[in-house]
């Protein structure tokens, strides 16, 4: 769990990144604070913190890293570094632990961040977003003066009659001709909402990152045929022999239905937004040590769907219902700048969930007055054995930070040193890393 403090203007300075949990200190400002702190602690300490451990493979002794670079990275492969080049000068590297400093010092590497864990974030307020009005074309010629009756059949009409009435409306925004890309936990491709009236799949591509296989529409159609040949027309095992990708959490299927379900599974009653669109789905990979995917996998997924949409010459809406609350929230992290840059590639829009942390009290911010002290309390549960705190400020501002334990002991003032600082208070170990302004 993370709790974060502070939110300011662009060109913020991450003055400290603290973690409870904490070998070599590296002060290179081409790396983010959290990565520097992760590299400077012992492996035992790293294992006690989810945020510090994310991206490190203990068996291979490698780090997964996000880089912003220029030029050519092909020479890194000769040193045993795995390179995945993304669009617009972004890349994902799998670097042996002993080569991280070497990679950092390369002139073509502009900045490095470590991956972060992602969590579910989805909004389901279809009606509150006025989508019914958009789909129906309010103000047009309808078979019934009440638009809701055309959707839900309050007039007793059939689904066919309701669809015929909608076809007369001037707006008629159904998603036809558009691609919807769902980057999530996968999809139940056997669900009728993701099939055309003739029983073929609406999914053009399904990339299962866990298997690193891209399944085509033809393969999914073959799986659907095998499914229908079973007893009672439902042989899931036969289908999974052909396309063995499943959405175990159901989150991706629900998101896909909200965005693009055509309502066939409910006789047209529960229909999504772009119900005549076609889909591309990426099932984000889940490392064995974690329950959720990482930002690196999200970036690879966005790169894949945008490249594919451009090859097909189609507009695409990319839905991201995973996220996290890490960082300064000013749009300058490598993930955020990557998504900003990607909006100019081809014809696309990228949509991100607003999160589920509205009542979590995980952030605070405001203005400090000259010469005055402000106290901010952190609530830590009895069973919470590690958490992280970030403080961000504008570059020109100067202030000091100290910590007060539950017993009243004062720790600090924290020093402005570009290195790991270690403190101990009662049974709590505190690690701090002070950082200077960076380009990202």
Please give the residue ranges for each predicted region.
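Subtilisin-like serine protease catalytic core
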Residues: 167-296, 313-317, 347, 385, ...
């Amino acid at each position: 769990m993370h709790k974060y403090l502070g939110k300011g203007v662009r060109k913020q300075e991450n003055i400290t990144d603290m973690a409870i949990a904490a070998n070599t200190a590296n002060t290179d400002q081409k790396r983010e604070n959290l990565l520097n702190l992760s590299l400077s602690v012992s492996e035992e300490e790293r294992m006690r913190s989810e945020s510090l451990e994310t991206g490190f493979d203990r068996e291979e002794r490698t780090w997964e890293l996000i880089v912003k670079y220029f030029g050519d990275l092909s020479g890194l492969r000769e040193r045993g570094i795995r390179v995945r080049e993304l669009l617009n000068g972004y890349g994902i590297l799998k670097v042996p632990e002993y080569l991280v400093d070497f990679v950092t010092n390369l002139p073509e590497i502009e900045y490095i961040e470590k991956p972060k864990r992602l969590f579910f974030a989805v909004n389901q307020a279809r009606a509150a977003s006025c989508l019914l009005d958009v789909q129906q074309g309010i103000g047009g010629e309808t078979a019934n003066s009440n638009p809701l009756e055309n959707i839900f059949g309050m007039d007793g009409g059939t689904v066919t009659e309701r669809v015929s009435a909608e076809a007369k409306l001037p707006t008629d925004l159904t998603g036809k001709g558009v691609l919807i890309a769902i980057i999530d936990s996968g999809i139940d491709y056997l669900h009728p909402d993701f099939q055309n009236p003739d029983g073929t799949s609406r999914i053009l591509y399904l990339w299962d990152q866990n298997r690193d296989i891209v399944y085509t529409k033809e393969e999914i159609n073959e799986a659907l045929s095998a499914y229908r040949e079973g007893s009672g027309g439902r042989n899931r095992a036969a289908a999974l022999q052909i396309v063995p990708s499943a959405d175990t959490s159901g989150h991706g299927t629900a998101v896909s239905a909200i965005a693009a379900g055509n309502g066939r599974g409910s006789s047209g009653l529960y229909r999504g937004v772009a119900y005549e669109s076609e889909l591309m789905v990426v099932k984000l990979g889940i490392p064995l040590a974690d329950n959720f995917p990482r930002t690196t996998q999200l970036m690879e997924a966005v790169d894949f769907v945008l490249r594919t949409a451009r090859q097909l010459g189609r507009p695409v809406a990319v839905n991201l219902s995973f996220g996290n609350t890490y960082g300064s929230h000013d749009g300058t992290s490598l993930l955020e700048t990557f998504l900003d840059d990607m909006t100019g590639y081809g014809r696309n829009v990228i949509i991100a969930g607003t999160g589920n942390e509205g009542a979590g009290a995980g952030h605070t911010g405001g203005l400090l007055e000259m010469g005055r002290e402000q106290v901010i309390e952190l609530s830590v549960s009895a069973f919470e054995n590690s958490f992280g705190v970030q403080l961000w400020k504008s570059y020109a501002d100067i202030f000091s930070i100290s910590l007060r334990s539950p017993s009243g002991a004062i720790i600090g003032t924290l020093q402005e040193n570009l290195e790991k600082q270690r403190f101990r208070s009662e049974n709590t170990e505190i690690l701090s890393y002070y950082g200077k302004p960076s380009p990202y």
